[in-house]
Amino acid sequence: MAKQYETVIGLEVHVELATKTKIFCGCSTAFGGAPNTHTCPVCTGMPGSLPVLNKQVVEYAMGIGLATHCDITRVCKFDRKNYFYPDNPQNYQISQLYQPIARNGYVEITVGDTKKKVRIHEMHMEEDAGKLVHDEWDDTSLVDFNRSGVPLVEIVSEPDMRSSEEVIAYLEKLRTIIQYLGASDCKLLEGSMRADVNLSVREVGTQEFGTRTEMKNLNSFKAIARAIEGERERQIELIEEGKAVIQETRRWDDNKESSHAMRSKEDAQDYRYFPEPDLVPIVIDDEWIEKIKAKQPEFRDEKLERYKKEFDIPQYDAEILTESKHMADIFEETTAICGKPKKVSNWLMVETMRLLKEHGMEPEDISFSPANLAKLIGLTEAGTINSSVAKEVFEQVFEKDVDPESYVEEHGLKTVNDEGALEEVLKEVIAKNPKAIADYKGGKEKALGALVGQTMKAMKGKANPGMVNQKLREMLK
C-alpha cells in the first residue's frame, strides 16, 4: 500500500509598515524614489551614526499583536542579527529575538466549512535591508539603499497549516486585519507584504516533523500556492527514492514553476544574535496597551455580522465589500448620504469592480468620493438619466471624481421625457422597420426589443427605455 503523506507548513510573513519615516531615522519610506535618495548615515550604516526608534512602528506592531490575540511583551528589546551581504551596510540587522514585541497569538481561518486557529509563535520588529539591482548586460550588481531601514513586522506562525488552501486563507485574513488597522497596504507585488514558506512532509500519523525547507521569492497568492504544491511533490519524490531532504532556502521561479537551492537554511545561532547596545528596552505599560486597544477599528468579521442585521444586501455582496476597508468605508458613507444600501452595493459590486479590473487597480486605489456616487444614484432614481447614461457618467466619476449633476447638465445627458418628441421619433422608427413590426405582430416579442434599441439610438440614449417600450406597445396595437 502506498504511503500517505501530510504537508506541514509554517509561515514567516514580513509586513512593511505604513510609517512616513524609517524605523531608526527620519528618512522617507516613500516607494519608487530615485535610487539612494531616501538615505542618511544611519540607514547606510555609517560609523558613529546612532539609531533613534520611531514610536509609530511600536504602536503599529502593538496594534497588529492585539488584533491577532497576542500577548504584548511588557519589556521588549532589540537584538543584532549578524550577517554579511551587499544590501546590508552595517553587516548586521537590528531585529528582535529574545524579547519580541508580541507572542502566543492566533488567527482564525475558514476553509470550506471548517474553521481552524493558526497559532502565532511570535511577532517582532526589524529594519529592512537595501535592494540589489542586477544589470544583465553589464554583469554587475548595484545597491539601492532607499529600502534600508524601512520598518517591518515579521509574524512567525506555528507549523499549523496542512495545505495551500489553509495558507492562502491565513494570509488573506492576516492581510485584511492589517489593512483594516491602516498599518500597511500589504501589496505583495510592491513587496509591502512578503511570505516565506517553511514546508516539510511526513507520513500520515507521524508526530515527528520532517526536514523543512524555506521557499522565497513568492510575490502573489497564486505563486505561493504553486510553490507549496511543487515543493511538496519534490520532497515526497526524494523520500520515495530513499534520498534525504536537505534543510535549505530555495528560490521559487514562478515562470518555470520550479525552485532551486539558494543556500543552506540557517538557525538562530548561526546569526550570533546579541542585545543591541544602542537602543534602550521598551517598557509597555497597561495604559499604553489600553490606548492602542481603544484605537482598534471594527474588523471585517464584525462588519459582516453588522451588515447582515443593518443592510438588506446578499451575503456574497457583504463579503466582497468588506474584503477591503476602503471599499467598506465607501459603501457605508454613500449609504449614509442616499439611504439606498442595495443600490450602492450594486454600483460597487458591478461597475466599480469592472472598472477596477479594466484599470488593473485594487479597491484601495478607488479615489472617487461617496458624495458623487450618492449623487449619481439620486439622478438614476429620479429618472433624470437612464441606466446606460448612468454607466457613462460613472466612468467619469471613477476616473476623475467629477460631479455627476454638473457633468449631466454640461453634456446634455438628461433623459427626454417629452411624449410629443418621443412619438415623432417612434413614427420614423416604425416606418423604417416594417419587418420588425410584422414579426412583433406575428407574436415575436424579441422584435419589440429591436425597435426599442433603434429608438434609443435615434435619441442618442437619452430616452426612458420604459416609456419607449410602453409607447411602442400602444402605437402597435
Task: Label every PLM stretch briefly.
Residues 1-298, 309, 315, 336-340:
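Basic, nucleic-acid-interacting segments
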Residues 3, 312, 335-344, 382-385, ...:
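Structural motif
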Residues 18, 198, 202, 233, ...:
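Amphipathic alpha-helical core segments of compact helical bundles
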Residues 191-203, 308-330, 341-358, 371-373, ...:
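Core structural elements
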Residues 337-338, 344, 352-367, 375-380, ...:
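M16/insulysin-pitrilysin zinc metalloprotease superfamily fold
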